[in-house]
Each structure stands twice: as C-alpha cells, then as structure tokens.
C-alpha cells in the first residue's frame, strides 16, 4: 500500500502528514462543501503567507 504524505501549514509552521489537509482545513471545512472549503483555505493560507498566488496547487490524490 502506497503512503501519501502531504505538506500542511498550521500555527507551528509546515507539517508533513498523511492527511490531505491540516487541522486548519478541517476547522474551516466544517459546514461548507469541499470546494468552498478548499477555496476558503487557499485564500486564508495566501493571506497568512503574504503572497499574491500560492506557489503550489491543491489536488486530491487517489491510491
């Protein structure tokens, strides 16, 4: 079985985890559709990092 690792940002900085999104994402995701949640997460992350565009993209990985 292939293990996927994902980089997520949280209050401690960059974290490598086996979950597609970090804690921040699931906090925001609560009560939104997945697409809305990802859009909100990207926007929040963009502002947190202080950039115009994120230097990476989000995609779902299926085994």
Label the model's feature ranges:
Residues 11, 20-24, 59-61:
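Intrinsically disordered, low-complexity serine/threonine-rich segments
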Residues 1-3, 59-63:
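Short intrinsically disordered terminal tails
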Residues 15, 22, 41-43:
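Short intrinsically disordered, low-complexity segments
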Residues 30-53:
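A short, charged, amphipathic alpha-helix used as a generic interaction element across diverse proteins
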Residues 1-16:
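Short N-terminal "domain-start" leader segments
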Residues 18-36:
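Short, flexible N-terminal segments of the mature chain
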